[in-house]
Amino acid sequence: MKFEPSRAKAVDKLNHFIENNLSEYSKLRNFDFGPDNRSNISCLSPYISHGIINELEVIDKSLKKFSFAKNEKFIQEVLWRVYWKGWLELRPNVWLDYLMELNILRDQFKSNQNYLNAIEGKTDLECFTQWVNELKETNYLHNHTRMWFASIWIFTLELPWQLGAEFFMKHLYDGDAASNTLGWRWVAGIQTKGKHYLASEWNIKKFTDNRFKNIKLNENASPKISKKSYTLIKREFNNPQNIDKKNLLIFENNLSFEITDFKNNKFKKIYLIFNKNENRSIKLSEKVLEFKTFLTKDQEQTLKNNSINCEVIDISEIKNITDQIIALYPTVGENLD
C-alpha cells in the first residue's frame, strides 16, 4: 500500500475505487485483510484530511456512479470526518483540555514499562504488535482496526486514551485533531457518555479472516468516566465581499486551491502554510512530516503552473505579512492554535 503525495494520484485513487470497488464497499468495509489487500476500502483519508480532495468532491463523484441508496454507507463514512470537525470547532476547549491532560500524562508515563511496550510493539498480543508495526511502517490503519487498537489500549492494556491518541497522531498520514481525538474519546466512553467500544476476540478473528490467535482481552470493562461537559461556543467568521488583490493563507488541511470557492479570485499572493514540529504540541514522525511537505510542494507547483504567485512559508512567519490577508480557516487543531 502506497500513498503518493499529489492531487493527481489522489484523484486517480478515487476514480479507481469508484469504478472497481465501491459497489462492494458496504458488504466488505469492516474486513481488514492486511496492508497488502485494501481493495475493499477507499484509502482516501490521507488525501481528504489534507484537502487534496475534499468530501464534497468524493461524494459527488460517487453519486455519478451509483444512486444514493446503493452508496449511502460510503457517504455516511465520508461525512463522519465533516461531522467531527464541526463538533470540535464548536467546542474548542475539548482540544485545549486534551493538550493540557496530555502534557501531564507524558511526564507520568515516560518511564512506564507498559506504555513503552505498547508503543514499541512488545506486548503479548500478536494482533496489537502487528498493528503497531503496520502503523509505523505504512502510516495507516484500517478504520475497524483503529477501533480495536484503541479499545485494547484503553481497556486491556489500561493506558490513558490521551497517549494513544497522540501515538496515532504521530504516525498516521490522515491524523487530524477532530477525527482522531474524538474517535478515541468515543471508544473510551466519554464522547457519548456511558457508551464505550469494547473489542472482542470473536470480532477481531471474524473481520481479520482469522489471521490472529489467542486474543485475550478485557471484554467486560466499564466505560471511562469524565465529569467535564462542554458548551457550544459560537464562532464568528467574516466572508469579505471583495477579496481580489489580497493575500490568501492556505493551511495543510485545505491544500487544493482548485476545488475551493476562491479558485476564480485574483489574489496578490497565496501563502501555503507549513507547520514544523517545533511549532506543534504533538510531534509528528519524520515520515508524516515528509508526506505533508510533498503534498504542500505539489500544491505549490500546481499554483505556479497556473501562473499564480505563491510561496510556502512556516506558520511562524504569518506575523511578518503586512498586507491584508484572508484565510481558508484551519477549523481546529494545531494550525488554529
What are the language-model segments listed below?
Residues M1-Q76, W80, G86, L90-R106, ...:
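Trp/Phe/Arg-rich N-terminal binding region typifying the photolyase-homology
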Residues I48, I53-L56, K61, S67-I243:
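Active-site-proximal binding-pocket segments
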